[in-house]
Amino acid sequence: MLKFQNYTYDEPSTCHSFEINNIDLAIINGIRRVILTDIPIPGIIGEKLDNDDPSVDIVINNGALHNEIIIHRIGLIPICLKEDEIDDYEDNSILIELNVKNTTNKTIDVRTNHITATRNFVNISEDELKDIFPANKISKDYILITRLRTGEHLHFKAKIVKRTGRDNASFNPVSLSNFSYIQDPKEADKKQNILDKERSYYKNKYGDPVRFKFDIESINHNIGPKYLVSKSLDIIINKLEALKKELNSERSTKVKIQQFQDIEGTFEFIIEDEDDTLGNIIQSYIHSNYIRENNKFKDKISCTYIGYICPHPLKSLMIIRISLENVSDPTSSKIFASFLEENCSIIIEELSKIKNEWTNFAIENI
């Protein structure tokens, strides 16, 4: 069975759906999480972040909404660049400006079609602006920024920067990224209870789900699952490559290896700047291959425990704990680092194969 199949697109909701088969649940959840938090996209900083101030300068505003609300609303405006433009984008290369004064005798709407912009100090054409700030397909309206009464004036300038949803939700490329288990109708027919029917999904011999429906609603009309899924797999691969590099470094500042509570044959890896996404993928792969399937490392070494923990939800810190048996020196960290590094390499190979299958599927179907 193909890993990806049955792509559909619902235009009113902009929802892309497709089925995923026989891919580890942790990898699918990792793709979902990375799409939501780790894909860099251009946008406007509409509120103070940890390392950034708002990228909006209010020149004149004597309307009903005060500056903080206007800046926040501007920060939520999607910047719809194309895939190659997103990848190559450098901070502040696009500058936008809006200057509207109500000289009529009635209240007017100020919308994104009033915005002008420059790219590298060259004016962006009106047609391109309509693509960057598109109207709603159903209502044909542009995004409402504010309303001005007679004599009121709004003038602002803003810089477009590239950040991720981890920095702020306004840099989230999607409004929806989730998955569900596909029900097995033969098993569901055997159940009388509605909840039992919902639990009757396709499973492997361990009871894990193996068929999924993945849904993505993209905010930017120029990018969709073809770009987002590929990008998320690249990011996960890069995270694993970076971890491998740190494991090989004797002077690593991001990975600390130490024996866990003086328990012989158990070491923990304290990893900075990582979270559940990577931890769950590594844990799931090692558990499936060494504990469930009882495979050996270097033909004789058994893994008896693999687990991870992120001690605090607001701190990017992950701890992986591994127990190995039949090691020549259970107090040496080298064999544990080698074990984790080799498994990272195997996961990278698997993710690369998945990406190739996804690319072929996307070319033919999306």
What does each of the following model-derived ranges do?
Residues 1-366:
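Protein-protein interaction/assembly regions in multi-subunit complexes
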